[in-house]
């Protein structure tokens, strides 16, 4: 019995630690540079991503999804701005920024295509990925004339346990880091 308990503990720990990093780092699901060179001195404005057409998942959990729809755009935008600034971009703004936005600014716009809180009950009682949340985005980078320079899309699955709200917030943070990573790689290429 002692060995069975150890084995179950080992398998649980292995599953837990391997899923913590699942899908967290790395490239976005889709990222395409259509034209242009991005410099770290280029002015970039991050617009809050729209949630108006997002799939909010099961209607039973709509109240949680609506709360996610209110917080996710700001979390995503601020995370992108913070990541870009810390990597050396010198002129990155968002709607809350003070001052004028330069006329030749690139715009990062997009939308949440899915904000599904999943089922907290399934995560608590079943675990192992049951009831996981999912956050998906898509968008584009355009120049000041509206010409598309790049497009992207990405999804982030929750870890499969715990409360829906923090999972969605973490999903938005990770998507923000991955989108910023795409822009950083573009500037470094």
Please provide the spans of the model-predicted regions.
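Bacterial N-terminal signal peptides
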Residues: 9-19
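A structural "domain/chain start" motif
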Residues: 20-79, 155-156, 184-189
């Amino acid at each position: 019995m002692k060995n069975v308990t150890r084995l179950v503990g080992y398998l649980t720990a292995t599953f837990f630690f391997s899923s913590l990093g699942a899908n967290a780092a790395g490239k976005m699901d889709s990222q395409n540079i259509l034209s242009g060179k991005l410099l770290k001195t280029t002015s970039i404005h991050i617009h809050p991503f729209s949630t108006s057409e997002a799939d909010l998942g099961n209607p039973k959990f709509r109240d949680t999804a609506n709360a996610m729809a209110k917080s996710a755009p700001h979390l995503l935008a601020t995370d992108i701005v913070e990541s870009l600034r810390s990597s050396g971009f010198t002129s990155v703004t968002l709607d809350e920024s003070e001052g004028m936005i330069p006329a030749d600014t690139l715009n990062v716009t997009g939308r949440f295509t899915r904000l599904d809180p999943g089922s907290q009950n399934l995560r608590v009682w079943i675990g192992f990925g049951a009831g996981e949340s999912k956050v998906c985005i898509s968008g584009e980078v355009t120049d000041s004339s509206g010409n598309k320079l790049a497009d992207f899309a990405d999804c982030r699955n929750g870890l499969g346990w715990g409360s829906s709200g923090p999972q969605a917030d973490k999903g938005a943070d990770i998507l923000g880091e991955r989108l910023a990573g795409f822009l950083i790689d573009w500037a470094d290429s």
